[in-house]
């Protein structure tokens, strides 16, 4: 089985099947798919905005027609578990991640757009 066949099989799976697969992989290889995520502080006041913005929020405006690919991209980029990443995608429009540097935000935007989502930087 090659990589494309594996990806195709994963795309065909339901969310429940994906969750079980992740749990089985975690158990078999002794790893955790969930990475710690730092929570950004509250939004700064409007009067505190600098000339050039140094922190950006990645805003998921629309998930497009490829929901599973967008969920996978959100998981990969944020380190969230499957359930949490699905929640972020299901709650769109909304922020995926806040307080990122310009480079990190643009990289995240690019990867989410490759997955089929419409993304804005705020």
Swiss-Prot record:
<feature type="compositionally biased region" description="Basic and acidic residues">
    <location>
        <begin position="99"/>
        <end position="114"/>
    </location>
</feature>
<dbReference type="GO" id="GO:0006412">
    <property type="term" value="P:translation"/>
</dbReference>
<dbReference type="Pfam" id="PF00542">
    <property type="entry name" value="Ribosomal_L12"/>
</dbReference>
<dbReference type="InterPro" id="IPR036235">
    <property type="entry name" value="Ribosomal_bL12_oligo_N_sf"/>
</dbReference>
<comment type="function">
    <text>Forms part of the ribosomal stalk which helps the ribosome interact with GTP-bound translation factors. Is thus essential for accurate translation.</text>
</comment>
<dbReference type="InterPro" id="IPR013823">
    <property type="entry name" value="Ribosomal_bL12_C"/>
</dbReference>
<keyword id="KW-0689">Ribosomal protein</keyword>
<dbReference type="InterPro" id="IPR014719">
    <property type="entry name" value="Ribosomal_bL12_C/ClpS-like"/>
</dbReference>
<dbReference type="InterPro" id="IPR000206">
    <property type="entry name" value="Ribosomal_bL12"/>
</dbReference>
<protein>
    <recommendedName>
        <fullName>Large ribosomal subunit protein bL12</fullName>
    </recommendedName>
</protein>
<comment type="similarity">
    <text>Belongs to the bacterial ribosomal protein bL12 family.</text>
</comment>
<keyword id="KW-0687">Ribonucleoprotein</keyword>
<feature type="region of interest" description="Disordered">
    <location>
        <begin position="94"/>
        <end position="122"/>
    </location>
</feature>
<dbReference type="InterPro" id="IPR008932">
    <property type="entry name" value="Ribosomal_bL12_oligo"/>
</dbReference>
<dbReference type="GO" id="GO:0003729">
    <property type="term" value="F:mRNA binding"/>
</dbReference>
<comment type="subunit">
    <text>Homodimer. Part of the ribosomal stalk of the 50S ribosomal subunit. Forms a multimeric L10(L12)X complex, where L10 forms an elongated spine to which 2 to 4 L12 dimers bind in a sequential fashion. Binds GTP-bound translation factors.</text>
</comment>
<dbReference type="Pfam" id="PF16320">
    <property type="entry name" value="Ribosomal_L12_N"/>
</dbReference>
<dbReference type="GO" id="GO:0022625">
    <property type="term" value="C:cytosolic large ribosomal subunit"/>
</dbReference>
<dbReference type="GO" id="GO:0003735">
    <property type="term" value="F:structural constituent of ribosome"/>
</dbReference>
